[in-house]
Swiss-Prot record:
Coiled coil: none annotated. Plays a role in intracellular enveloped virus (IEV) transport to the cell surface on microtubules. Together with protein OPG056, forms a complex that interacts with host KLC2 (kinesin light chain isoform 2) to engage the kinesin-1 complex and thereby promote IEV trafficking. The keyword Transmembrane helix does not apply. InterPro entries: Poxvirus_E2 (IPR007585), Poxvirus_E2/O1 (IPR021155). Disulfide bonds join 496-535. Keywords: Acetylation, Disulfide bond, Early protein. This is Protein OPG064. Belongs to the orthopoxvirus OPG064 family. The keyword Transmembrane helix does not apply.
Amino acid sequence: MISVTDIRRAFLDNECHTITKAFGYLHEDKAIALIKIGFHPTYLPKVLYNNVVEFVPEKLYLFKPRTVAPLDLISTITKLKNVDKFASHINYHKNSILITGDKSLIVKCMPYMIISDDDIRFIREQFVGTNSIEYILSFINKESIYRMSYQFSENEIVTIINRDHFMYEPIYEHQVLDSDFLKTMLDKYGIVPINSGIIDELYPEAIIEILMAVVRPRDAIRFLDIVNKNQLTEDSVKNYIINDIRRGKIDYYIPYVEDFLEDRTEDLGIYANIFFEDAIDITKLDITKTELEHISKYINYYTTYIDHIVNIILQNNYIDILASIIDYVQDVLTEELCIRIVCESTNPVPVTSLPIHSTLVMVMCIQMKYVDIVEFLDEIDIDTLIEKGADPITEYTFTTRWYNKHNDLITLYIKKYGFCPMMMKRLMFEYPLTKEASDHLLKTMDENRGAIMFFPRTICTLPYLLCCNYKLIQKPIPFKEENRNIVYKKTNRVLCFDLLENSAFKSLIKIDSIPGLKTYNMKDITYEKSNNIICVRFIPQESIHNEERRIKLQLFDIARLASYGLYYIPSRYLSSWTPVVNMIEGREYTNPQKIECLVILDLFSEEFIEYQNLGNAVSNKYELEYTISNYQAAINCLMSTLLIYLVLGSIRSISKTENFVLSILNIFYKGLKINELLSEPVSGVCIELDKIKDRASSGDSSFIFLKKNELSKTLSLCEKVCVETILDNNQSFKSSK
């Protein structure tokens, strides 16, 4: 349980109405300790500024922009890849950043700064060269474009749009563009020429051709706004738009129809009532299912005929359509119809829209995995919800007032997330708890210290272990002395590094000293330094021609290096997958969407990061919003690596999948020096891996996309292995003291 004793004391002693207010009364040391673990309000008092700068500078965004010193800001954001949370601070200190920052820092900050014409002139003077200014300007934001008079070149426009397609909108509003350029952008990028530069090129056929390319209602409306009215009254244009409306593109043409098609209501058919009040008696029409689907989005225009529409829906068993207009048909909904809507409709309906909140309806909602089950609390007690297997604690619940209505819901939340700084921060500092609800929350947490509320199931889960004060302890590396009396051959390898402080060089030195490696064994290594360049010469490990054996031995090396504090970041396979972040934020996670490479590649020293630098390295590599701990980053590395070697290894393996999986796990444990044996079957994992193998072998792609939850059993296995790794590591080092 997160310790809230000091916060509770401050809350009671100072008669605070919010937990945020109580946090401001904490002693600085106590406050900083909580801030370090990510447990803090959405803003901080100025009194904590110096301590935050010294101990957790990445949290400077919690102060008002004017409180943050420019140099402190620049020093902090220079080290971070993801600076989204500093957006207002970056714009506030724009001038200091432009004057002080180098090109890479300015590029990083451009999306957040409101750039003026004077700023562009300054950037041109600072960074001479067309390519430099074009590259920097490609990161400009739309707010800047709306405020400047600077005219972008066609090359600059293309560069900006290549980076962010939707920047065409402010650019096209900003300046008149050549018609040939506009046509090219339409053909190449599908960008509608909503610009006065195209007006002279428009005629009915061209207007229709452009409308055929439109994919956003807003673009259709804005394009028709610039067209000459005489051309909009042409019959060919009217006929095309009427047919487009009948195809379902209703919201593309609402302003146009009201201005130009009042005399064509008969041609609009059932859709006429959307634009003109009760223009058509729809009871005289033969209404198709497609038409019902289209008008259901605009059912408020058909209230006169709602009974007629409902009769057609029920006669034809169109449950999906009934669900889409549920708020307009409350009187006809029985318990049976509510259950059918829940079970048969493609999209979930809001529980608040179900007029009957019976236990049976609730059970159906639970089975269909509804996220707003909490709304049944208006009729059903929380114990019944839990007994039936409901989880009323979801993202949706934060959008309601239920936490202030039910103290039992807060208690349930604490049982689920009381160990998790991120999730408790959301409820305590970001949700508008009443004073009474805040008091109950603090009292419950303070009176249930330790892990008493999390026994027996939660304490052995990976999310719990990631949020608790664990760490991975490494074995000391037995450094060996350099041997200089070596005669080299031409086949020897040479690696050069630009600095002695180079992290890849440091990793290489440590790797060379770790005993027992199978594939990353560099023989007879020597170093030569010259002009700040250091060259490493060594005899490479002999190639292993058996692919399956090479993969297994390579995984052994990765695990063995991890046991000595050198962790492999598999970002060339998984470019954006960080399951640990989801877990510490209390969110569900699924398998990666894509594996970038289907071949297990050779290892390089720069891919291994020392444990003490791992949190920063992983956070920057994946551009996370905040820096995770070294311990959390290590688990992310181990879990990602194990997943990759299971998936890609099984694709390359010629062994029976079950034997391969068990062998991989055994090797992984052996490399980490963990005495564990898997006690559960892996048949479900094998089925998943075999399906991936079949799919990969039937194509010739160098990468593979994964469906959601396609590797759920495999991920569960990886989680369990990580849990065993954490528990074994901490227990082993405790017992060895």
